[in-house]
């Protein structure tokens, strides 16, 4: 028998229908392992291949780190709950999960905005690119993204966990997402919800402003390019980033900006599952499948491993 505290929460989980639980568990586990593996491989390739030692790939390695931590914040607990009869999460663990979730998602918001700036410099100021995106500036940009995300976590987590909760402590979700947790509050949360709304709008508005400005200038530059080859190369440089931005920001807009009257618990779970489970797997695939440098680096590492294995076999 599991000992529970009166301050603990119960996560109702992703599914109501237990008949499909086995299939869903297998799919989520496969996606989780695939996402972690793909992102770790991406980080490894960027570190070992000198062709990938560029500002764009440095920022991409930061995205892979964020995605790995992001999916590890929610999915292991979800998988454990799916095989366990007890779906308890302690008050402290819930607070930690909220903080890590807010930090990772906030950092990713800012990083995607900074990656748009990187695209802008690469397309619009290619001759000054090494100066404008030198190592020191890349480190500062990455640190700024992490700081912005952690600021969101440090601001909203203490307020959320200090709201009085009483009565039912069953969270109709598969992790401690703030909107689902606040539904259990036994006090007026309108002021806090307004504060959260403002924070989320700012977290979206600042990066979206950078993205919109960057791509407006990129489109103007592409329009002026005389050659079709140059235009194609410019579009290729930015297309992967635009795809990731559309997926990630679309889901975030639904969750945190769209009024609650447009939400249902089941829809919220589906959208949350998409951007907490699926998106971290899609990001490395989107960037690698359409990128000759990444594919080339992977083939090079694979060839080296194959050669080493053949040498080891022949020596044996």
Swiss-Prot record:
Designated name of the protein: Olfactory receptor 2T11
Originating organism: Homo sapiens
GO biological process, one term: detection of chemical stimulus involved in sensory perception of smell
Sequence ranges on the Extracellular membrane side: 1-22, 77-97, 156-192, 257-269
PANTHER family the record matches: OLFACTORY RECEPTOR
GO MF entries: G protein-coupled receptor activity; olfactory receptor activity
Signal peptide: none
Compartments in which it is found: Cell membrane
Annotated S-S bridges: 94-186
Keywords: Cell membrane, Disulfide bond, G-protein coupled receptor, Glycoprotein, Membrane, Olfaction, Receptor, Sensory transduction, Transducer, Transmembrane, Transmembrane helix
PROSITE patterns the UniProt entry points to: G_PROTEIN_RECEP_F1_2 (PS50262)
Chain ranges passing through the membrane: 23-46, 55-76, 98-117, 137-155, 193-216, 234-256, 270-289
Family membership: Belongs to the G-protein coupled receptor 1 family.
Function text: Odorant receptor.
